[in-house]
Amino acid sequence: MELAKVLDVLRAFEREAVDYVLVGGIALALHGLARATQDIDLFVAPDPGNVERAKAALRSVFDDTSIDDIAPGDLAGEYPTVRYVPEEESFVIDLIGRLGDAIRYEDLEFEEREVEGVRVRLATPRTLYRMKKGTARLIDRADAEALRRRFGLEDEP
């Protein structure tokens, strides 16, 4: 995935004042742990006003009326993830309100980092480790182990 496309989305999120945190493979890459990925994973504060700002940001990058199908309550519901597939692109954008009962937007620790002139709200290595260490997916467990080694992370008591 081209970093320029990711930064276009994050620049729009910054411009629209969206409360978000970048997680997933791209966040790992920005922490120096390269992993191939074809999605942009964004934890988004699930309040309706913030979801509307996220939609406005997406509309400013993608000329796609399907963005309007994202409802303000989607990220606060029983299945709090929306997968948006931009037309004519080879990646997807996952908007996440929470991960089950384990991790909510409010639980995330993040740092702000400038990447090619764009302010990025990036999950900390510890947050990424917490998100990935106990999942069933092998790739997530491998990511957790890489984070643990690289940043000297240990499980919390």
Where do the PLM segments sit?
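Compositionally biased terminal segments of proteins
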Residues: M1-P157
